[in-house]
Amino acid sequence: MVVFLLGLFATLSIPLFYSGANSALHADARKISTVVRHLYNEAAISGAQHRIRCDLESGRFDLEFVDGAGEWRGIENKRNTLELDNEVRIRDIWSEDSGKVSSGTATLNIYPQGWMPATTIHLQSGSGKKSKNLSIHLLPLSGLAEIEEGYYDFEG
């Protein structure tokens, strides 16, 4: 009886957690929040400024840091880029220090003092009435992310 109830519960609840159409969108949002948190910690530990350069057209995130000579370099011995799934695109990025960027390249700076500008990244999958949006708000004092369904502006 217990096994039957567990099976019934799993059958009813698992589809609620994993929606095929939204899985790439949510997976990319989690990847972005994980990368930001990792670079936030790396900046605090190493004492070097880090940044993420986001190419909005290609959905590519380049991860960089300032070396001892003051030059920007890709993160070594680790993945130094993040690319979004083909189904997912960046609608725009708003940052406290640079405003809203809807095309081209946006730069997210992460400072070694344990701070980054408040930032909101808007992701979208699909088009027309079937499009889905996610808003990722990056918190300045912790590097943590709040992920919300829909298109939200957290600025102000």
Which role fits each region the language model picked out?
Residues 1-4:
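N-terminal signal-anchor/signal peptide hydrophobic helix marking the start
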Residues 8, 12-34, 41, 45, ...:
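N-terminal helix-rich module
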